[in-house]
Amino acid sequence: NTMNSIASLIDSRPEQAEQVVEDLSELFRASLVESSRQTTVADELHLCRLYLRIEQLRLGERLQVDWQLDEDLLDSAMPSLILQPLVENAVYHGIAQIPEGGRVCIRLSCAGNSIVVGVENPVPASPAAVTNGHHMALDNIRQRLRALYDDEAALIVTPGADVHAVELRMPRERLA
């Protein structure tokens, strides 16, 4: 889909096509990094923004994003590519399946000594539009959290009739 979007932009909007190629390249580079590597919350949010900018080309105004971020947490440590798959799931299983689109809400807050990240998206009204998937991204995130934090971190999925919510909790640490 992304490559088709780029191809369609090359003649009409070459600067935008170039930007999408750069965004996609940065996402590819990030995906090649060792999965146990720590980065900052700010860097993870940057990858989410790159991904959402690419999806915005495909979905246009159907994709709305609401960022609710505690700026004091931006320099906290976070495993590389732990948040972007949650945002991707929200777009793929939620927004893209709804003809009129919807809003992805991304929240970042602190609860005691924990970072709490929430990602919410609307649920398609038609049962035929719901794509359950294989939960590979969620299983991968749970395994990584367990390996890095043992029982101090959690991924909580709350499917609802109207809203699908995912909450990621992990210890707040500074990047060493």
Language-model features, listed with the residues they occupy:
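Two-component histidine phosphotransfer core
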Residues: 1-158, 163-169
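C-terminal end segment of the histidine kinase catalytic
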Residues: 171-176
